[in-house]
């Protein structure tokens, strides 16, 4: 989407704002939830010494929540706006790499990764269907894909924003509502239907949070775990 705004810079500011106060606790909780299923598979030996791909690494905020029993960890993002923080992670752990990648056209070979983790990216994409096809292409048979889906504009998410996050976003160049309207262009229902089609021959598990009710409008986010058959 073409706009007159510097959305990359506003995203950086927004993330800095989210990692302050109570919202930081909520964000870290969602990271743990996104990593949980894959970590459990590692703990029981179903995924061992894996090569991991993270889509939407940002400034590396998900990494501390990932089980550290892996062979290689590829952090990727559409730009290098968070590279300063990620470089520190790479220096401390030589198994970690950062690469600028477009999930709609990944440079990796097919059947390359054991585990793929996509942070809050799918709602932002211009070509989400193509991105899902790319994820399926580069994951190995038996590999796990974990996808974070924002439920914007759900009632629950809007309430959380009103109570906690909106007041933090006054330093953005545009209203926070407009930022989300531009960035979260793909609805949760459309994303789920695309996932069901692209991964129709695979094992799909859809979990709603913070409640277990299967209604996106009563959720703040959805996590989809897929095992390629």
Regions found by a protein language model. Name each.
Residues 1-46, 49-58:
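Conserved class I S-adenosyl-L-methionine
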Residues 24-26, 126-134, 144-229:
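S-adenosyl-L-methionine-dependent methyltransferase catalytic module, highlighting the catalytic core
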Residues 59-105:
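Class I SAM-dependent methyltransferase SAM/SAH-binding core
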Residues 64-67, 132-136:
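A structural alpha-helix within SAM-dependent methyltransferase catalytic domains
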Residues 104-116:
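A short acidic, Gly/Pro-enriched loop at the edge of an enzyme's catalytic core
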């Amino acid at each position: 989407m073409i706009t007159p705004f510097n959305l990359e810079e506003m995203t950086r500011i927004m993330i800095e704002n989210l990692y302050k106060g109570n919202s930081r606790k909520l964000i870290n909780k969602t990271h743990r939830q996104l990593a949980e299923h894959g970590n459990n598979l590692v703990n029981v030996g179903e995924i061992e010494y894996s090569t991991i791909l993270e889509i939407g690494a940002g400034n590396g905020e998900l990494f501390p929540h990932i089980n550290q029993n892996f062979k290689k960890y590829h952090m990727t993002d559409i730009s290098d706006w968070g590279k300063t923080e990620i470089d520190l992670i790479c220096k401390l752990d030589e198994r970690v790499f950062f690469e600028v990648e477009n999930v709609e056209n990944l440079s990796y070979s097919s059947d390359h990764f054991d585990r793929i983790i996509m942070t809050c990216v799918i709602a932002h994409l211009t070509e989400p269907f193509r991105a899902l096809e790319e994820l399926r292409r580069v994951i190995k048979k038996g590999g796990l894909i974990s996808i974070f889906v924002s439920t914007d504009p759900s009632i629950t998410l809007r309430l959380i924003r009103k109570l906690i996050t909106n007041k933090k976003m006054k330093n953005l160049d545009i209203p926070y509502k407009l930022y989300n309207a531009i960035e979260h262009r793909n609805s949760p229902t459309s994303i789920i239907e695309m996932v069901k089609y692209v991964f129709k021959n695979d094992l799909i598990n859809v979990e709603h949070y913070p409640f277990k009710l299967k209604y996106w409008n009563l959720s703040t986010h959805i996590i989809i775990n897929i095992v390629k058959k």
